[in-house]
Amino acid sequence: MAGSKLVLEGRVSVKGFILGLSVVVIPLIRTLFGHLDWIFDYLTETPGKIAICIHIAVINGLLLILYRGPLYKVAVRACFLGITFGCGVIISFSETTWTHFGWYMCSLSFFHYSEYLVTAVINPHSLSLDSFLLNHSMEYTLAAVSSWVEFTVEKLTVPELKQLSWLSFAGLLMVLCGEGLRKAAMLTAGSNFNHIVQNEKAQSHVLVTGGVYSYFRHPSYVGWFYWSIGTQVMLCNPVCILGYTIASWRFFRERIEEEELSLIHFFAEDYVEYKKKVPTGLPFISGIRVN
């Protein structure tokens, strides 16, 4: 792990995320003078929308005063994720049938923010705005939008489909386990972890086989795979559950084969032996074949 002191960009992101998260304060204050069922109105009724807009404008103005250039770009992204997480918390604790979507908002925003923060801790030299994974790919964006559209359409046309609490809880469990496994993999790999497949071996690059890597060769991908499917199980999105499973499986199969080419080039027989002993962790994916 890269030292105990968090780099400047990491500290800025923490402050930005907390500022965004402060969106939960207004409804909490309001509940002191009203009832809990008002909380959801905070997000849906006109006064609530106005309050959110003013709150965001004030926070953004503060960020513009505090930071410039690259640091502002970090802060505003972290703040956006904090706001999303905060709104998810508000919905999750509201008396509404949209509770599970609140869980989803928290899960999605936390995933993206924690990707940046953990990278800032373990491998600050590779840290960039891309570490948020917000612009991961066009396919990733389309998949996310598709899940929102499916949830909304089915919520309006087949509302009972979105009331399967046991299924949403199962999805939440998948999300928590997947998120935990991925972050454990990142922390275990330390400076060896990178969001981009490396084609050249760095001097500090070592083969990590301990911790969660003793169970799966690619624990970060295993975690991400089940996290992504879990988000759709949580939303009770039957179409996207199938779509996410197929798309994620194909993506990680190709990614693992590409990565293992580099790993065999870097570590030769050491990786081949490790590959023989430890599975990838993903169903029906064995990685690149070695003769």
Regions found by a protein language model. Name each.
Residues 1-203, 230-291:
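Membrane-anchoring alpha-helices and their flanking helix-loop junctions
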Residues 196-224:
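Active-site-proximal inter-transmembrane loops
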